[in-house]
Amino acid sequence: MQPAYPDPARTLLRGGLVADGIGEVTQRADVLVDGPVIAGVIARGDPPAECAVIDLAPGSVICPGFIDAHVHAEGPLLAAGRVDGALAQGVTTLVVGQDGQSWIGAMAATARYLNEYFAPVNGALEPARDLSVAAFRGAVSGRLAQNVAVLASQGTIRHNVAGLDRGPLDPGQRAAARREVEQALADGAVGLSSGLDYLPSRFGGVAETAAVAAPLAAAGRPYVSHLRAYGPQVAAGLAELAAVGAGAGARVHASHLWGAPADLRAAFEAAAAAGVDLSYDMYPYRRSSTVLAMLLLPPELQARGPAATLAALADPRQRARLLAGE
């Protein structure tokens, strides 16, 4: 999805230092933008006819917009059509629908669950309702200030067909989930994400997830995963990712990857030897943020939803068992 462009769409950015991402040397030049297209990098001089002119502050750099390959921005995009903090950093493309937990693609019951479970990350969908990929695209059409790509979400789709059921999807549920992936791709989704630390995404095993992700192969789209394991266990997490890719016949991508370099290299070499196209993104700092329950509570305690989890934690006996590591 592309942003809406102002009238006049032809704009000259004048007085900057151009870093085009191709050459090693910057150059002093002006940049002519025509809607979504860079129409030219031109020598300093009088502006072309019929274009707006923006005079840049001394020392300004003109460069291609940055891509945030992993962002939770559904809420501000639906509400305002933009993410101001990202724009201020030069981010012009956002990839949402991450970690298998987006209310884009949700049925109303799933949206209500995500409003309780994941709203601190994605924002809430109010009122909770069915919101397909096509419906989201329609809701933001003509209002965007940034390019937006949407991933379908495996956990969302799993909740649509099975709620918080911990067991494997039965054949009918698998077929229903696969149809949802096919429809999301037809509606413009650019891949399928999962979040194997989150519920109910983590309840899907390799065979199930590969079957649900199978439509990606024909569409040429990737399977993008928040792994089940990072750090000391990252090799196992990447092996599972590669197994899903092999089963689905799709390219795979590891979200916010971290671990020991030797472990990462071995896992990537193993994936390549198995014929799996594996890529990754990584953030440049040592801290992250997520849902506290993911880190501290066993999955079985969360399996009936946030309200039931809070009720269980109110029981002194349950708290004692947790503190004892039982």
Give the ranges of each region predicted by the language model.
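Hydrophobic, small-residue-rich alpha-helical packing segments that form membrane-like cores
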Residues: D99-A106, L114, P120-L227, G231-E240, ...
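Polyanionic/metal-chelating signatures
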Residues: G105-E126, A134-R137, L144, G155-L169, ...
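Divalent metal-coordination and catalytic microenvironments
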Residues: G16, V31, P36, G59, ...
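Hydrophobic faces of well-ordered beta-strands that scaffold small-molecule active sites
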Residues: I67-V71, L94-V96, V148-A152, L192-S194, ...
